[in-house]
Design a protein with these regions (language model features):
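S-adenosyl-L-methionine
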Residues: 1-19, 34, 56-86
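Conserved class I S-adenosyl-L-methionine
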Residues: 19-28
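Conserved SAM-binding loop of SAM-dependent methyltransferases across substrates and taxa
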Residues: 29-42
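Conserved SAM-binding motif I beta-strand of class I
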Residues: 44-49
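Conserved Rossmann-like nucleotide-cofactor binding loop
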Residues: 53
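Short SAM/SAH-binding signature in class I
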Residues: 87-95
Length: 228
């Protein structure tokens, strides 16, 4: 079978090192591992899925792809899908909340010693995930942002290392702040618009709540205007 990958997952695929042994957590239909093998970019993969329906769908797709000898589909929760003996070098976790991704990593962090790269694609709470990476000895070496079906997705590529981030970098992303892509600006301009609507609904007498929202708006404007 030939997999038509969404642009969101194609962007993730660009960060997978050639020759990697991949674990794709929450693999759903196993589209990403199949695509990477079709392109000759990885040597093997584990497709981990915790829900029975998507697990069975992944099994069927792997069978149709002819990659049964290269992709092992496992019904397991998070990093429980692999053991050190699997020699996984790269882990992808995509399309989940940042807090959930952090919880998945935390539950299996003892297994991360031999893993070279994490490729993470949260769709919210990105700051929670960056904090987890800081606290657990990972450095974000690359970031990107894209939009698909009206949602914004950030990609974080992390490897073992030391990282110190400012409060703004934790919230907005150290590389994304520097790059200031059009999508990044659109995401945060939309957030300003939401906050301004919220501000308009707060009575003038409620100065505490108004000041909190005004501070958030000011911080975003500073980032978009390159004020450190």
């Amino acid at each position: 079978m030939y997999v038509q990958l969404s642009q969101r997952l194609k962007d993730v695929a660009t960060y997978v090192p050639k020759g990697a042994k991949l674990l794709d957590v929450g693999s759903d239909h196993a589209y990403l591992p199949i695509y990477l093998l079709e392109k000759g970019l990885i040597t093997s993969a584990i497709a981990g899925e915790v829900v029975k329906g998507p697990y069975e769908s992944a099994l069927a797709n792997v069978s149709a792809s002819g990659f049964q000898d290269k992709i092992d589909v496992r019904l397991a929760n998070g990093l429980a899908a692999f053991e050190p003996a699997d020699e996984v070098t790269t882990i992808t976790i995509c399309g989940m909340g940042g807090r959930l991704i952090a919880d998945i990593l935390d539950a299996g962090k003892d297994k991360l010693t031999g893993v070279d790269r994490l490729i993470l694609q949260p769709n919210n709470r990105e700051d929670d995930l960056r904090i987890w990476l800081i606290e657990n000895g990972f450095e974000i070496i690359a970031e990107s942002i894209m939009t698909e079906n009206g949602k914004y997705y950030e990609i974080m590529v992390a490897e073992s290392g030391h990282m110190s981030l400012s409060d703004k970098e934790v919230r907005f992303g150290p590389h994304l702040m520097k790059d200031q892509s059009q999508v990044f600006q659109l995401k945060w301009q939309r957030e300003i618009n939401k906050l301004e609507i919220a501000l308009g609904s707060i009575p003038l007498a409620n100065q505490t709540d108004r000041a909190a929202i005004e501070d958030k708006i000011q911080t975003i404007k500073e980032v978009l205007n390159h004020v450190s």
